[in-house]
Amino acid sequence: FIGDSRTVGLYEYGQIGEADVFADNGMSLFNLWSSKTACGGERKTLEQLLGENSYQTIHFMLGINELGYSMEEIVKQYGEAVEKIQEMQSQARIVLGANLHVTGEQSAESDIYNNQRINELNGKIEEIGREKGCYYFDVNEKFDGESGSLSEEYSVDGSHVLGKYYADWLSWLQEKG
């Protein structure tokens, strides 16, 4: 699993088990290759982790922290990251995860971190997945309300699900394959 604070939530509350997790609060495409996170008790870069291990499946979910950049730059960085992961783990099935929506209130309060931009980015991520032969899963179908926003019953801060729902998220991923 590679990702940001939402992936940290999956790790801390989702009962991932023995899976390696390269995630941190604030992780982005722009610091992905220079960051180190604790994996297996040792702080490593993503390049070290991918170089030392062989994975069957890699879940990749980044993008929300990048929304302050131009969509063109985000898509460029995203595509390059996927290509590098594919080069280093050619046998792995790569699953690109849509970015979780924010609540309607959170979306209305921001010109940058809103569901319109998240949907635009998710569409671009889905395109990258098609172009590069990756799978794409959109967890918003699990947590959105009728308005197409993260349902407030699942969130306190407007952008993350409550800890007790990360296990549901992981189960949903497992059901999707």
Model features per residue range: what roles?
Residues 22-25, 97, 137-142:
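Conserved beta-strand termini and adjacent loop/short-helix elements that scaffold enzyme active sites
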Residues 32-36, 64-73, 85, 109-115, ...:
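Second-shell loop/turn segments in exported
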Residues 89-93:
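A short helix->loop->beta-strand "cap" motif at the edges of active sites that frequently abuts
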Residues 1-77:
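Conserved SGNH/GDSL esterase-like catalytic core that processes O-acyl groups on lipids
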Residues 78-82, 122:
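Generic structural signal for well-ordered alpha-helices
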Residues 61, 97-98:
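Alpha/beta-hydrolase-fold catalytic nucleophile elbow
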Residues 102-177:
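Catalytic His-Asp segment of secreted/periplasmic serine-dependent ester chemistry enzymes
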Residues 50, 85-87, 129:
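N-terminal cationic-hydrophobic initiation segments that often serve targeting/anchoring roles
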